[in-house]
């Protein structure tokens, strides 16, 4: 799917170097196609790196996707130039009256922070409530899953004693579900979180369908029956070296982090890791875009007919 982004966005050249099909806004205007409008609420500190990761997964299908980047934290960023944020991100007030085919809410490094202490918690809640009336389908990733479960279902924050970090085996529970179409019976996916998502809690306190679980990582992929909500508790968007970067960051800070599970060859951080989850990540996002967004969204976004209570 050619992703439609501003001509000057750094991700354009980065992804083209990987032979990813990126269509600039100027070229897209020459095609008489109604693109899917996807809003990405990027909560990660290294925003450019996260943009590259998610845009890569949104890029592999024949339809156009018009990407809009959203921020809700007005504080000065330590990891992303202000010029980049000003040029490529919108504020919520800019889009609150608009409708979108899809919304992606990324993770955030807030695993040990109480919800009440998250500076932009009111803004997160506002976006999630707004999406009920303005977005066809929303995909929550990692920490955003925990936030959404609290806001939508009243589930309190659950935290692991030790950080879950590594590449874990997962089991597909519903291979014929639309979101898992084409999934292997077992596959690998990376996790990096303190958040805990016990399968029994999801089943007891929500009406969500658990599609994939992991013996070590708990519930991995679950969704609402009307396809308007999807939750992935891991990081299928991660690059091969993302977990390594987190490990060495914490090691250099004197935090004595555990070596990520099933990641470095022979568990040796001096050896370069390889991505073993890339095909799964692409398939997950293609399925979400096709079955949860494209197949159910109205052609005219002014005629949204939300069914989410």
Curated annotation (Swiss-Prot):
Source organism: Pectobacterium carotovorum subsp. carotovorum (strain PC1)
Keywords for this protein: Acyltransferase, Amino-acid biosynthesis, Cytoplasm, Methionine biosynthesis, Transferase
Gene Ontology biological process terms, A to Z: L-methionine biosynthetic process from homoserine via O-succinyl-L-homoserine and cystathionine
GO cellular component: cytoplasm
Native organism taxonomy: Bacteria, Pseudomonadati, Pseudomonadota, Gammaproteobacteria, Enterobacterales
Reactions it catalyzes: L-homoserine + succinyl-CoA = O-succinyl-L-homoserine + CoA
Matching Gene3D superfamilies: 3.40.50.880
Site (Important for substrate specificity): 192
Pathway given in the UniProt record: Amino-acid biosynthesis; L-methionine biosynthesis via de novo pathway; O-succinyl-L-homoserine from L-homoserine: step 1/1
Designated gene of the protein: metAS
Primary subcellular site in the record, as a coarse category: cytoplasm
EC code(s) of this entry: 2.3.1.46
Protein name: Homoserine O-succinyltransferase
Pfam families tied to this protein: HTS (PF04204)
Signal peptide per UniProt: none
UniProt similarity note: Belongs to the MetA family.
């Amino acid at each position: 799917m050619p992703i439609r982004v501003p001509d000057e966005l750094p991700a354009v050249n980065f992804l083209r170097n990987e032979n990813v099909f990126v269509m600039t806004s100027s070229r897209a205007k020459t095609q008489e196609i109604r693109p899917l409008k996807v809003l990405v609420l990027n909560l990660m500190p290294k925003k450019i790196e996260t943009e590259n990761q998610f845009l890569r997964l949104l890029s592999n299908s024949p339809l156009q996707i018009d990407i809009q980047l959203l921020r809700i934290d007005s504080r000065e960023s330590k990891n992303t130039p202000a010029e980049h944020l000003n040029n490529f991100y919108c504020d919520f007030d800019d889009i609150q009256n608009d409708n979108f085919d899809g919304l992606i809410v990324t993770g955030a490094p807030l695993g040990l922070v109480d919800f009440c202490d998250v500076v932009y918690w009111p803004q997160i809640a506002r976006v999630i409530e707004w999406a009920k009336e303005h977005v066809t389908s929303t995909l929550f990733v990692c920490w955003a899953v925990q936030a959404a479960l609290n806001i939508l279902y009243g589930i309190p924050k659950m935290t692991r004693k030790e950080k879950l970090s590594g590449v874990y085996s997962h089991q597909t529970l519903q291979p014929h579900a639309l979101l898992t179409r084409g999934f292997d019976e077992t596959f690998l996916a990376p996790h990096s979180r303190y958040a805990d998502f016990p399968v029994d809690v999801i089943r007891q306190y929500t009406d969500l369908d658990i599609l994939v679980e992991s013996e070590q990582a708990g519930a991995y992929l679950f969704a609402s029956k009307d396809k308007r909500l999807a939750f992935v508790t891991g990081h299928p968007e991660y690059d091969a070296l993302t977990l390594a970067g987190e490990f060495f960051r914490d090691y250099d800070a004197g935090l004595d982090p555990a070596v990520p599970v099933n990641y470095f060859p022979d568990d040796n951080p001096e050896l370069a890791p390889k991505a073993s989850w890339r095909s799964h990540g692409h398939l997950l996002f293609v399925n979400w875009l096709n079955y949860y967004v494209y197949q159910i969204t109205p052609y005219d976004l002014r005629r949204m007919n939300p069914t989410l209570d």
